[in-house]
């Protein structure tokens, strides 16, 4: 079973902050029920054992929308800078938990005037914690009580690269019609 909470705050039309928390609980052989186990996980000390043991992820993110500025930002719809930092299970170890992952990107919703071409460039890193602490391997999307980890049918519930990876992603798309995207 999976429970998630997301809180977004838009202090201005050009700036957004978000917090997300995912909790995996229950499953075969685990007598845990909603909402009790999730409530306990949210108010108790993290990383409890026994019937309170759950698999958790916590993330904080931002999005900065910069409007088009002639000669400086020449894109008709402006551009967006975004980022996310997350932690797996050991979220209480602030300011930078040992099991941290990062994602950062640039999105240009309209590259040329009168065209539907967009561009996204993104970098993600789920290996940062292992590089800081070599004993931490296979941390993201994995958990000892939940042997398949934070996954659905083998695929991580999060970034496609999975655990212990870095990824540079570049994508451009164009709408050929209102419903057909290339």
Predicted regions and their residues:
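Extracellular/periplasm-exposed beta-strand and loop segments of Gram-negative cell-envelope proteins
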Residues: 153-162
């Amino acid at each position: 079973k999976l429970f998630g909470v997301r809180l977004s705050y838009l202090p201005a039309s050009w700036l957004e902050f978000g917090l997300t928390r995912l909790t995996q609980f229950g499953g075969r052989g685990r007598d845990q029920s909603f909402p009790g186990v999730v409530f306990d996980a949210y108010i108790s000390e993290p990383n409890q054992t026994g019937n309170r043991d759950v698999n958790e992820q916590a993330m904080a993110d931002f999005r900065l929308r910069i409007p088009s500025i002639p000669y400086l930002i020449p894109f008709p719809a402006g551009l967006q800078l975004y980022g996310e930092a997350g932690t797996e299970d050991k979220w209480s170890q602030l300011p930078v938990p040992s099991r941290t992952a990062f994602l950062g990107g640039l999105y240009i919703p309209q590259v040329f005037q009168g065209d539907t071409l967009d561009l996204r460039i993104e970098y993600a890193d789920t290996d940062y914690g292992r590089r800081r602490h070599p004993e931490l391997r296979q941390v993201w999307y994995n958990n000892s009580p939940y042997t398949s980890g934070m996954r659905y049918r083998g695929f991580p519930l999060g970034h496609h690269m999975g655990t212990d990876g870095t990824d540079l992603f570049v994508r451009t798309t164009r709408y050929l019609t209102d419903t057909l995207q290339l």
